């Protein structure tokens, strides 16, 4: 039987390197973090062969004392901590003393460093675990570390590396994260001798724009909130900017990039009311807290952490983001161009870009190449086969509702008119607005003479509602509205769904329960065993949602009361859907966690259905509701409620001004 023996230090370092240095990007991270801890204000990175052939990092930090330069390449040698108490309060990026030793054991490493009070630099080399004697060298104040031929002595590890392009991409991403976390430091990157980027010391606002992109910066909401010793700040993207990828998600804890389940779950919860399930939010979040409140000594790469009070962190992140998103209401800052990107992320269909003034020669080619779908897409919005032209992206936008009969439509016609008694004046305001906008155009009928100047009663641009005024209804699905220099298209079902949803949430928060309305004649329906069980378990909960059901026996349930604001909904479908939602509540989930989903389901049943014809006052009342409703840019499922076509974009379609 083999005897137990101590492993040689070089082998121990190579084993440790398997945890710390998985690929060139990890080696780059360890070296750059040392530069940050050294107080550098400028860091230059050069890569060759994707970081496999060479990683060179130069900084202008404090440097290493000549007597310590050999020790810097020994395992567990560090200047960051000396006691266990120091470890619990560590604020530096590195602290274990494993990084350089691990890199030196699997590469040909050269370390050159000079302190401010030294007349020359000191250089030491390491190859295959063997250190050379320190020698004098020429070097400015600071440190340069070169790691060449990574994994040259561990071919089994090297064969697991990807292509040079892939490894470079990982290195560039790693450096961008470090640059984003430390905007006060200038960063530069060269790849195979060519400059990739050069970032000066910047403000956080400027660094976010440089790394994440100007498009993110334009579509983001700034946040800055605190709770005791915790501070959360940064930027989160509006839901309309959401993508199908997670490449624009950054979480930093004490300026260290992390992948933390607590923070990510809080972000997901904050966006769940406004984001389509096929999309992911974009954000750059910085959480500052005392070092003793977080344990970073959990994973060799330090990307996983553990909070002392994770509930406090979750609440801070969720409430901060939820409040910022709730403050977003319908306005005229979104455009149909961004909606096309959203549709591409949801459906995978590439939309045709809006032509610019210089693209007139390609306009008709773009129209002819516009996606028309297959035969199955030629069904119209009412679910039957029609002769109308197929509508691109109909599957992404079409409300998943059956069309109403004429009798049902008439019965529900006055919903919004009852809520807004003064909407009769909207038609007059609209006509005045049109006169102001197009009053100089020739008219076949002379305008009547009046002693009152026309401008006295015309709303100015500042008085116009953000979503303008409705002018027509399209295909029983969309509302066309005219605003200043733009045409708006509103999905009436999606918009009404959000309005009803927020009203029910507000009523539930203020009163604890939704007001119910008893049915004159109870409606019975055949139920499944699961639905009957859900009623037995959650009858009291249903009452809180304004639903009163009773078990008639024989798997038959009766609906006796429904929420007052949903009085005209299909009560059977409403009851069955809510029961199904409740049936999904398991032992690890509570009603509170499902509450918004239940309210969203209920609001869907009480919203305007496809095929219902609205009057202008009803359409305008819905627009005013949207302007006063939080998160009204998206429906409960995260789909856009409206898009905008500017006058310039409309002119381009007709080659005006070409």
Swiss-Prot record:
InterPro entries to which the protein is assigned, alphabetical: DNA_mismatch_repair_CS, DNA_mismatch_repair_MutL, DNA_mismatch_S5_2-like, HATPase_C_sf, MutL/Mlh/PMS, MutL/Mlh/Pms-like, MutL_C, MutL_C_dimsub
Q: What are the boundaries of the region Disordered?
A: 114-137, 437-456
Q: Which UniProt keywords apply?
A: DNA damage, DNA repair
Q: What SMART domains does the record point to?
A: DNA_mis_repair, MutL_C
> Is the keyword DNA damage assigned to this protein?
yes
Cite a single GO BP annotation: mismatch repair
Q: Bias regions of kind Polar residues — which residues?
A: 442-456
Annotated Pfam families: DNA_mis_repair, HATPase_c_3, MutL_C
According to the UniProt entry, its GO molecular function terms are: ATP binding; ATP hydrolysis activity; ATP-dependent DNA damage sensor activity; mismatched DNA binding
GO CC list:
mismatch repair complex
Family of the protein in this entry: Belongs to the DNA mismatch repair MutL/HexB family.
Q: What does this protein do?
A: This protein is involved in the repair of mismatches in DNA. It is required for dam-dependent methyl-directed DNA mismatch repair. May act as a 'molecular matchmaker', a protein that promotes the formation of a stable complex between two or more DNA-binding proteins in an ATP-dependent manner without itself being part of a final effector complex.
Please name the HAMAP family in this protein's record: DNA_mis_repair
Please give the name of this protein. Answer: DNA mismatch repair protein MutL
Species, as recorded: Neisseria meningitidis serogroup B (strain ATCC BAA-335 / MC58)
Taxon lineage: Bacteria, Pseudomonadati, Pseudomonadota, Betaproteobacteria, Neisseriales
What gene codes for this chain?
A: mutL
